[in-house]
Each structure stands twice: as C-alpha cells, then as structure tokens.
C-alpha cells in the first residue's frame, strides 16, 4: 500500500511536496547562516584579524563543503538508499543488516550521536536569533550587552516550543513550508543586496581560496577552522533522515533553490565583511554577527523576528526527527519501549513524552550553562561528524550491491577521508563544551548496547517448546468442567517468531501455575518489518478451533495496538467459520458474538540460579532495571482498557547452578 504523507504522493514531484520539504527537511541547514560566519570570524580573533583572502577562503570552504557533503553525498547518493521511502541511519541499517551482524555497531553509534548533538540545535539557533535583538537601537539602549535577558527570552521560547508538542503540530506544520520558502528567499535577497556591492566575491567559488586558507598563516586555527566550517552542513544528516516525509524527488528538485539562496547569503556576508573590515567602529565591537549586521537597519526588527521564527521551525523539525529516530530504534529493539502518542491524523505526527521532557531539560540546561551562542557554537557539530562517518560505513555496504565494488570502495573512502578530517578538526570542541553532546551520545549508546545485548542473550537461551505437543492437554483443560472457567479468550503475547513453538513459561502459566480454562487460547507475536507502514497478519490454528497463533507484521512506523488488531482478526475468523461464535447472554450490545478477553503478561525476573558470565549477568540486570523504568507492556500494546493480568516468572538463562542438600539425621 502506498503511504501518503501530508496529502501528497511522496514518489512524485509536487508543489505541496516542495513546500513540506522546505518546512521539514531544510530547517537546520537553513538557519546555519545565522552563526557560521560569526563563529569563523570570532574564533580567528575578530574583524581586525581577518583579511580578504581569509574571508574568501572561508566562503570557499563553506561552498565546497555544501557541494561535496550535502549535495553529492546526501542529495545525489544517499537519497537512493531509501527503505521503502524512509531515510536515516536506522532505515539504512535495515537495508544492509543482513550483510554482517557487526553493522549494528555503526548504526547504534550514529543514531546515538545524532540524537545527542540534536539537543544543541534548538539552543544554538534560538539563542543566536534572539541575540540579533541587540542590533535594534531601542533594545540595546534598554538592555545593552546584558546576556540575562537573552537567556530568559530563549528559555521562554524553548519552554513554549516543547509544551505544545503534546497537542501535535499538524495544523501549524502546514504553515512551516510557506514560511521557510519565504525565509530562504529572504536569505537570498539580503545576500544578493550585499553581494551586488562587490561582485568580485564570486571568486570564493574557486577551490583555490579554500585550499590556500587551510595552510595560510592568516588562519589562526589551521585545520581546526573546519570545525566551524562544518556548522554549515550539520543539517545534511537531517535532510536524509527526513526523506520519508517528502520523498527524494521533492528534495532533489528543491535543493538547487535552497543551495543558491544559502550561497548568495554567505557571499553577501563576505562582501559586507570586506566592506567594513577596515572600519574602526566595527573592529571595536566585542562580537560581530555578519548576518544581522548586513541587514538594512530599517528592516532589522523584521529580520530578527523572521530569524526567530525560522529557528523555532528548525527546532520543531529536529524535535519531530528525534521522535521518529527513537521510535525506529524501539521497533528495531535498540531502545526500551516508551509511550508514543499520535496527536494528529498523520502517522508521522507522533509525540513521545519521555523524549520531549529529556530534550527540554537538556536544551534548557545547555542555554543556562553556555549562555551565549558563541559558547554553544564552540560545542556544536562534533557528534554529527561521527554520525556522518557511520552513515558512510553503512552506505558502503549498500553501494556494494548497486555498483562495482571498486567504485563503492572509492566513493566511500573519499567521503570517509573528508569526514575523518572534519572529525579531528572538530575534536577540539570536546574541551569547549563538546563533551556534553559526546557524554549524551555515550549514555545513549550504553543503553542501546545493554538493550540489544540483553535481547541477544535472552533469545539465544530462551527455552522453546512445541505448542502442538500440548494440544491434547489444552483440549482436555478446555473441556474439563471441574476447573472453573478462567476467561472465554486468554491471550498471551509471545516474543518468539519460531513457527509452532512458544516460550515454555507460557505453557507453564496455562497448565501449572494456575490452570487457565478457556474457550480459545491466543498466542500473539508482533514482528516489526523493514517496511515502515506494513499492517498484515497470518494465523495458524494447528488444526483446531480453540488455539490461534497470530503473527502480526507491523512496519517500524506503526504503533503496536494489539487490542485493536485482535478485534479485527476475531471477526475475520468468525466470518470465515474458522472460529466458533461466542454468544453472550449478558451484554450492552444485543446479539454480541464475541466473548470476553484476558491478556496475560508475563514479567521476568533474573533468577539467582542462572549461571551467567559476570558481564552478561550485569547486562541482564541493567536491562531489567531499565525495563522497570520505562513503558509497561500494557501501555505499549494498547491494552490500557483491557483485562490484563501480570504474572512474575523467574528468568533462567544458561545452565542452572546445582544445589545439593544433605538431610540432617536426628541425634538422640
């Protein structure tokens, strides 16, 4: 089934798709002009220490970074690596994971780094935009260089932004596209106005100036200047991650306009810098932001407001992207289950309360700790270089199936070499605040490792039994009137996907722990497919009319509301005569033919008799501890309003520790 988002076909070029792309895909990269040249000039010692060749070289590096990484790697190559229309590092992983079990490592590292570095985006973009208020005379006269008012305004905007997430962004989201189209047009026009004052700045497109700057003594940072240059392309990974919202055609057709507007703005900033670099008043300024300084004074207020709106939209796109990334990681069993809410009519519109709270707290803490955009820029971008490098590794295995091996290795080596240089040039940021993003990435990676390895240990040692072997006992129990009727339908959620086999604990629960007499025994397993929007099922009744093994096939974008799906399956089976009707004498619904349901959820606790390696035992203990802190199976599977019973069973993994007691004889 073709999935449609926002009311348009993602596979085709449409104006609606173009507008959505501008509102969702380009937010991060579209706000980079707010701070990139500011960071480059500031870290070189200010306006008094930059020359013409330095300015031209900086813009040249920006242009070629956008060309090589954003345009060639992502727009031209990576967008082809879509998983049924979905993009991003986890979707790419699902395409190549059969190549090697070790590919889970770059996928986890890249996903954790992308989530962690994203925390800085709302903080740095909104703070930079609000700092533009200082260029307004009335504001400057009232507050001067007082950073506290900037921090307060920024925190207020961030609080409002995260508070409205629970209500969904479907309505306001429709306005994002047109607003960002106007924003990019504004970037291009303002840039062109200043660029037209010195057309010779076009020389910056010559790569000679980029290479010259890297070895020039005028460049105080040397290769480390690339850490600031990289800020111009941090949104490239988000561009690939948001592929599923709009489709590759809409991104590829809209990108040339976006890039032209961005380059015009950077050229305009360069022309403005060349014009004022000898101005003593400008040189005396403690901090200079070419973006706001080059805007005509008469429309500066408009420019600051517009920049703030663009920063909020960019932050919203990142927040939505974080929800999607976490959701995909959960479906791939890389993160524990979290409560996911769908406030809008679009499946892509989701809200994860836990993620929202963590992002808000982290963003607010960063604003309070770093205070100025200059300090935030010094910390920004490090983790994204790691994500890009991990994407390149996964992309290599994708390309090996599409083009000759030598071409795949050559292309991957080319991008990896560039990204390694960017990584080491950004490494200095670790000591200037980059440790925050790296620390968060390591924390998230540890959770992913614990969860993935814990699942691996459990699945490798889980004791499976043949369900068919117990059909006679289940039939006898069903017909044994001496045992009280437990429920008309008893449902067990199983974690295994082996046909005809289930976990031994389930049979133990039915026959041994408390005999559960029922008319129908249901064993339901959910398999997350590589296709994002699959909604299918299959059944195996083992030749009976009282045992139903249900296999749900749900895409990694689909919520696992088992109760809803089970209702449909019951009616389908009754309609075809495979399941007897269950007429109810007492019901609010006259003629109701479906009986009551009891969902039995088995909770596992690590048994002390399990002989596990010390490391594996710690992994399992950590996994179970994390599991207790996250969403319950009842909430995850949409069973909040169903009859649910929890049963605790010992989780015995590996060989059991043997015990031997000796009877003490009575001594008379």
Swiss-Prot record:
Q: Does the keyword Transport apply?
A: yes
Q: Which InterPro entries match?
A: K+_transporter, K_trans_C, K_trans_N, Kup
Per UniProt, the keywords (alphabetical) are:
Cell membrane, Ion transport, Membrane, Potassium, Potassium transport, Symport, Transmembrane, Transmembrane helix, Transport
Protein's membrane topology: Multi-pass membrane protein
Highest taxon of the lineage: Bacteria
Compartment list: Cell membrane
Quote one Gene Ontology molecular function term: potassium ion transmembrane transporter activity
Major subcellular location class: membrane
* Pfam families from the UniProt entry: K_trans, K_trans_C
Q: What does this protein do?
A: Transport of potassium into the cell. Likely operates as a K(+):H(+) symporter.
Protein name listed in UniProt? Probable potassium transport system protein Kup
State the organism named in the record. Answer: Enterococcus faecalis (strain ATCC 700802 / V583)
Q: Which gene encodes it?
A: kup
């Amino acid at each position: 089934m073709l999935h449609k988002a926002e009311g348009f076909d993602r596979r085709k070029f449409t104006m609606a798709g173009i507008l959505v792309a501008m509102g969702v895909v380009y937010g991060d990269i579209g706000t980079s002009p707010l701070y990139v040249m500011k960071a480059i000039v500031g870290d070189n010692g200010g306006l008094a220490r930059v020359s013409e060749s330095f300015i031209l070289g900086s813009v040249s590096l920006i242009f070629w970074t956008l060309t090589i990484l954003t345009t060639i790697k992502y727009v031209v190559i990576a967008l082809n690596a879509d998983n049924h229309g979905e993009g991003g590092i986890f979707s790419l992983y699902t395409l190549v994971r059969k190549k090697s079990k070790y590919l889970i490592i770059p996928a986890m590292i890249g996903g954790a780094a992308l989530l962690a570095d994203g925390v800085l985006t709302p903080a740095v973009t909104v703070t930079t935009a609000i700092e533009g208020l200082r260029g307004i005379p009335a504001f400057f006269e009232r507050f001067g260089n007082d950073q506290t008012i900037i921090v307060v305004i920024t925190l207020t905007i961030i609080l409002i932004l995260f508070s409205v997430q629970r209500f969904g962004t479907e309505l306001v989201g429709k306005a994002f596209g047109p607003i960002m189209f106007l924003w990019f047009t504004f970037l291009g026009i303002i840039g062109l106005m200043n660029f037209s004052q010195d057309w010779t700045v076009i020389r910056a497109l010559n790569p000679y100036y980029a290479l010259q700057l890297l070895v020039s003594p005028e460049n105080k940072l040397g290769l480390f200047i690339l850490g600031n240059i990289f800020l111009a392309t941090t949104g490239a990974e988000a561009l690939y991650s948001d592929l599923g919202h709009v489709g590759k055609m809409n991104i590829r057709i809209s990108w040339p306009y976006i890039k032209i507007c961005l380059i015009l703005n950077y050229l305009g900033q360069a022309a403005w810098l060349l014009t004022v670099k000898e101005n003593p008043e400008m040189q005396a300024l403690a901090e200079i932001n070419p973006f706001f300084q080059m805007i005509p004074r008469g429309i500066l207020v408009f420019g600051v407001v517009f920049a703030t709106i663009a920063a909020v939209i960019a932050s919203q796109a990142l927040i939505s992207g974080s929800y999607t990334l976490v959701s995909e990681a959960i479906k791939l069993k890389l993160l524990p289950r979290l409560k996911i809410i769908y406030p809008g009519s679009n499946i892509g519109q989701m809200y994860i309360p836990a993620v929202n709270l963590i992002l808000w707290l982290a963003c607010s803490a960063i604003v309070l700790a770093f205070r100025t955009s200059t300090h935030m820029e010094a910390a920004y971008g490090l983790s994204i270089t790691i994500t890009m490098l991990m994407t390149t590794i996964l992309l290599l295995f994708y390309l090996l199936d599409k083009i000759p091996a030598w071409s795949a290795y050559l292309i991957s080596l080319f991008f990896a070499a560039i990204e390694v240089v960017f990584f080491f040039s950004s490494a200095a940021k670790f000591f200037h605040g980059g440790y925050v993003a790296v620390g968060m990435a390591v924390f998230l990676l540890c959770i992913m490792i614990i969860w993935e390895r814990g699942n691996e240990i459990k699945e490798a040692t889980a004791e499976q039994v043949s369900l068919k072997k117990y059909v006679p006992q289940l039939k006898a129990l069903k017909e044994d009137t001496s045992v009280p009727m437990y429920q008309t339908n008893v449902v067990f959620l199983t974690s295994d996907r082996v046909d005809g086999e289930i976990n031994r604990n389930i049979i133990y629960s039915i026959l041994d722990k408390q005999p559960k007499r029922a008319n129908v025994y249901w064993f339901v397993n959910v398999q997350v497919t590589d296709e994002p929007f699959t909604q299918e099922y299959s059944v195996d009744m083992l030749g009976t009319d009282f045992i139903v093994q249900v296999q749900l096939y749900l895409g990694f974008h689909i919520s696992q509301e088992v109760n809803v799906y089970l209702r449909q399956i019951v009616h389908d089976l009754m309609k075809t005569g495979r399941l007897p009707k269950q007429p109810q004498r007492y019901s609010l619904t006259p003629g109701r033919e479906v009986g009551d349901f009891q969902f039995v959820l088995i909770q596992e606790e690590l048994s002390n008799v399990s002989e596990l390696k010390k490391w594996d035992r710690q992994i399992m203990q950590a996994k179970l501890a994390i599991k207790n802190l996250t969403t319950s199976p009842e909430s995850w599977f949409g069973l909040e309003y169903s009859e649910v019973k929890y049963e605790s069973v010992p989780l015995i993994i590996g060989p059991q520790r043997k015990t031997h007691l000796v009877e003490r004889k009575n001594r008379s």
